[in-house]
Amino acid sequence: MTQFASPVLHSLLDTDAYKLHMQQAVFHHYYDVQVAAEFRCRGDDLLGIYADAIREQVDAMQHLRLQEDEFQWLSGLPFFKPDYLNWLREFRYNPAQVCVTNDNGKLNIRLTGPWREVIMWEVPLLAVISELVHHYRSPNAGVDQALDALESKLVDFTALTANLDMSRFHLMDFGTRRRFSREVQQAIVKRLQQESWFVGTSNYDLARRLALTPMGTQAHEWFQAHQQISPDLATSQRAALAAWLNEYPDQLGIALTDCITMDAFLRDFGIEFASRYQGLRHDSGDPVAWGEKAIAHYEKLGIDPLTKTLVFSDNLDLQKAVELYRHFASRVQLSFGIGTRLTCDIPQVKPLNIVIKLVECNGKPVAKLSDSPGKTICHDKAFVRALRKAFDLPQIRKAS
């Protein structure tokens, strides 16, 4: 299936902020590290028929480059350094790093190359896949239907929060990777800008063009890669946390907790890390149990939870965000990142549950175990066993 009308992507910055944040850290500290990443569809969708169309879009991405106005805008942000931005100015996507195949109806994608370059593929490639699939499956859906659905949800949201103090409710758009389309995401974000509780977007292109705050710190791959970068597997998570602070000592201080599991994370998150990091991000498992563990951990360390922020970003919608806000608002600072339920929330449209995750670093396996067993990713069962042993994990989790 080919012949999509035009390139889906129009800007190098049409990606999530944490990709550039991580890329700068990789550029400075792990310039020669090599990685491999693979696509997974967690649903039952057979997406192999779109392989040719995806390959065309991958080839078109080599023409994307950082424009002068984009360079100047990034230069005005407090956390990017000139050497990295000058390098990014010359960056071009290399389609040779991407292998796209149709395996009897199953879509297979494998990315290989230097981490500093491969890191850029995940978010825009997932956005391309999502937009292509929805273009063919739902040709008559689009911005109008998405905005109608959002307005309906906002009416319910207003009723749900009528008697709530919403002054500490902060919502972010995290919807780039599984959006219905670029146009839908932009329309949704522009509408949400009218709400006082909407504080920003993870999409750097939208943040620049709509004068929003870009949101994001690091992803699972940062912790996964350190499983092989660090000489000691048992201390790899601490090494990842320390390396992040080395690059960003006073900003971008939200740590992702579920690469190994929350319990394993908290064992590594001692007083120095807990004091220096601004807060934590939830991305799998029971959000209430996770939040209670986080608050208890801060209290045990003698840190006032109200000085820290918990970011919830796992499969959220507006109603779930309000429920979590009701539960936690008086005890800790809160932010909520909503993705698919904002940017692909259209009647009769089935969002794709798709990811691209790191599977190797320097030719050796890495794993994401998470707090939701269905999200576990690793080819090498022996490595998963070693990881469990290193982090003293009691529960055996099936690698997929």
Curated annotation (Swiss-Prot):
One of its GO terms (molecular function) is nicotinate phosphoribosyltransferase activity. Transiently phosphorylated on a His residue during the reaction cycle. Phosphorylation strongly increases the affinity for substrates and increases the rate of nicotinate D-ribonucleotide production. Dephosphorylation regenerates the low-affinity form of the enzyme, leading to product release. The keyword Ligase applies. It is an enzyme of class 6 (ligase). InterPro entries: N/Namide_PRibTrfase, NAPRTase_N, Nic_PRibTrfase, Nic_PRibTrfase-Fam, Nicotinate_pribotase-like_C. GO terms for biological process: NAD biosynthetic process via the salvage pathway. CDD domains: PncB_like (cd01401). The modification Phosphohistidine is found at H220. GO terms for cellular component: cytosol. It comes from the Bacteria. Pathway: Cofactor biosynthesis; NAD(+) biosynthesis; nicotinate D-ribonucleotide from nicotinate: step 1/1. Keywords: Ligase, Phosphoprotein, Pyridine nucleotide biosynthesis. Gene3D superfamilies: nicotinate phosphoribosyltransferase (3.20.140.10). Pfam families: NAPRTase, NAPRTase_N. Its EC number is 6.3.4.21. It catalyses: nicotinate + 5-phospho-alpha-D-ribose 1-diphosphate + ATP + H2O = nicotinate beta-D-ribonucleotide + ADP + phosphate + diphosphate. NCBIfam families: NAPRTase, PRK05321.1. Catalyzes the synthesis of beta-nicotinate D-ribonucleotide from nicotinate and 5-phospho-D-ribose 1-phosphate at the expense of ATP. Belongs to the NAPRTase family. PANTHER family: NICOTINATE PHOSPHORIBOSYLTRANSFERASE. This is Nicotinate phosphoribosyltransferase. It comes from Salmonella schwarzengrund (strain CVM19633). The gene is pncB.
